[in-house]
Amino acid sequence: MRVRVKSFLFSFLLCAGLAAFGEIAVTFYGGAGQVGGSCALVESGGFRMLVDCGTAYGDDHTSTNAQAETGFRFDPASIDCILLTHAHQDHAGRVPEIAQSGFKGAFWSTEPTRDLLALVWPSQLVYDESVRRNWVWSAKAKGGRTRKVHWHADCEWAGKISAHNRRSFTGTRAELDAHVTTTLSACRECLETEVETLVARFKTAPFDVPTKIGPFAVTFRPVKHIPGASAIYIAEGTNTLVFSGDLGTYRSRLVRTIEPARAADAVFIESTYGDASSGGREAVEAEYARFRKDVGETVRKGGLAWVPAFALDRTQRVFYEISQGMAKGDIPADAPVYMLSSTARNVMQAYFDHPEWNDVDIRAALPLFKRTKPRFTPSKHVKGGGILLTTSGMMDAGASVGLLPDLATNPAVRVCLVGYQSPGTPGHSLRSGAKEISVGGQQIPVRCDVKSYSCFSGHGDAAENDAWLANNRASRIFLIHGDADALAARRKGLVDRFGSNVEVVEPFKRYVFPVH
């Protein structure tokens, strides 16, 4: 009897040792079934953290987004920390909002991600439609100057407004603009204070060094989508989950190699371009050559090459290619270049200040940058030839919108589209060959020439992403960050090549992984 008891106890303890002693749960509140809005909740033993907190793109702002009409679909105060894969808005755009919505923890990222966010926040915060603020301004403006609107509690200028002249309103910036009849510009001190407050909440981790965060060992590994971009490895016990973030590509002039992912139990991988192929290096080089030729041809004819692009990384890649085109003789070396976005200019300067951020040292383009002009007037600068860089890349915001009525109607202008164009945007209409586009409620005839290029994409194609997954053929693979067609095509391709352990992530579904 005693032998049987001992045998039973031994078997019980052995089984208990092999059994799971906990679980990691993953729920996607954004980035599932859509491009953008990336936001995944990772939980274990009562510890709750987010991987990314991004803004959604496109027209679908309902079921699959992290956004909801009342804010977040989870309690921000319940989140212990937030990990950020990189600084693009679709992965980090809601950081200011969640910071003001009850979240009290730290943001974790690489140093370049933190530093790039600090550069893009000033322009984002001015018109951030997701954040409700207590706005304060004076009814009286000295000397007819534009009134400044304040919102930060520590702003000394807001404190100097007399009770008689003090005006206030609570709501988003759009609601404020609809409420007042005068022009209000953002207080610089409030902007700087809010950026400093956000930066102070960041903790940074070096690449490839495990960091203890709650019950997890978290490792940031470079994926070279933009400077600082990381795949995030989350390990507990013997289990490891990987979140790819956005994977880079050899198509970028600034990237040489991307190391494959390490083996993991589960991989959540982006599927932006589905199972599509870029055509290989020769096709990409031919596309770059076509871009340089088109820009050079336009300038030599006395026309304007207009390149709308995202302020963060896309403008910098385009600028570097323009400088290379001038060095090769494809583009006139004396062509005037205009870069209107202060954010894009600040990021460009940061690239020069930190050559270690990229695989390629771009400081050869610094002389061109020093003569680049920050202002552009269509009536003065279209004639004679030149190159214009503006935001936004989809031409639905920033300087691009204001310039469309003058430039889209001018046959001397060639629009060079270098990024994704969401349906409903002016950029999408131009790329689709529209004869008219809608700008501010007006129909504008299109007389400009329009070209489109895919070589500037920061995302890897199917073959590149397969190579990144090479060590994970036996892993569970989950597809995120893609539209329905791209996700379906990507799943089919991966099942054919990797096996049947591939699934498309559903929004709000709880995925559980036992911890051993």
Ranges and model annotations:
Residues F291-P426, I480:
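Hard-cation-handling environments
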Residues V284-Y288, A365-T377, G393-D396, R431-E436, ...:
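A general structural motif
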Residues V51-G54, I79-H88, A92-V95, F107-T110, ...:
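Active-site neighborhood of phospho(di)ester-bond hydrolases with catalytic His/Asp-centered motifs
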Residues C15-G17:
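N-terminal signal peptide c-region/cleavage motif recognized by signal peptidases
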Residues F21-A77, E196-R256, S379-H381, I387, ...:
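Core dinuclear metal-dependent hydrolase active-site scaffold
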Residues A32-G37, S44-T197, T249-T257, S432-G440, ...:
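Pre-active-site segment of Zn-dependent metallo-hydrolases
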Residues M1-L9:
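Bacterial N-terminal signal peptides that target proteins for export
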Residues P227, A231, Y250-M339, R414, ...:
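Cap/insert and terminal regions of metallo-dependent hydrolase folds
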